[in-house]
Amino acid sequence: MNEYKYLINMLYRLFGVEVSSDVPEDKLNWNIILYQATLHRVTSVLFWNLQKTKKASTINNNIYKMLKSQYEYNSYRDKYCIKTASELTKKFKQNSFKSDFVFLKGPILSIYLDPGFSYRVYSDLDVLMKKESLSNAKKTLSNLGYKQGKIDKNTDEFIEATRTEIIAHEFGSHETVEFYRIFDNSINNIIVDINYSLFWKKNSQEDLFPPINIESFFKNHIYYTKNDESIIGPTPEQVFIQTCLHLYSEAVLFCWQYSWYKNWGDLELVKFIDIGLFLNKKLDYRLVLDLIREYQVEEAFDFVITQFKEIFPLFKLPRELEIFIKNVDDVNYYFTTLGEKKYWSSSIAERLFEQQSRVLDVYKNTNLEDLYAKKS
């Protein structure tokens, strides 16, 4: 479909791979493009692409205004989240944390991968720290006005978590109940997730990855800076590996995701944008390969690199990572909550924009009672 090709070519341009546009913008079905761009969290990239190709004036004016508003909102939120993460870096350091914490994902990726505009859409700040630092972190966040709980989507009201809910969540997972700082204008609301391990999702009763010692993430930390803001984070090589493993776990363990059947969080182009922008960076690939072997996550990299190449065959990979290109059929799988490995009946390129077909495929091959979404 021309609309799908348009979106893929848009990302090629973002990666610096020049491709031609075969179909004029005014001949495309923008209902499809806007729907898919929203689901894949790439509306800011879409607006950037229209401006880069000098085609913004050719689309419907109301669509243009909507995309521009989304672009400006994402730009504001990105800068605001970076500023908040920088402030929290200072506050945590002032409260005897020293360097036993780092920020993950969101603002770190935004600063390091920066393609010249705020391409990432993220709503929370993820912090990795030692579990013994949790009490100190809670006190710091509380003094700054943060409360643990959740937002009711139907009423937009904040519901504070009970002590029982907080303890149960910390006991049963790798993270705390989310911390919210609520403002009168919700555009300024901030969510902080505190994690005390990198990965916790399991393939049935077994860990998807061997436990990763987080001490090296603290020991080898660096500071990511932009516009006088400074955020503590892992080295770029560690961030790259964590980003790939996060994509992999979301892609193969989506049966654990709440309401996957309507959110389709297993496959989003924004996650592959992160990978593509990383691959354009000059990482220390000898270190990357050493860490992959140390963490014993070769299977995950077989999956990520092969699937990335399947979606973007024109992208030239770093030579060192070509060892992870496998037969695409061998990495076209997911796990049920019972730990069974199931194979898709379609390729990743075929189901990338066919969300409902993914659901039908999973329901055909997986007992409905094995899907977490159907248990809730």
Locate each region found by the language model:
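Conserved NTP-donor binding/palm subdomain of two-metal-ion nucleotidyltransferases/polymerases, i.e.
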Residues: 1-123, 129-376
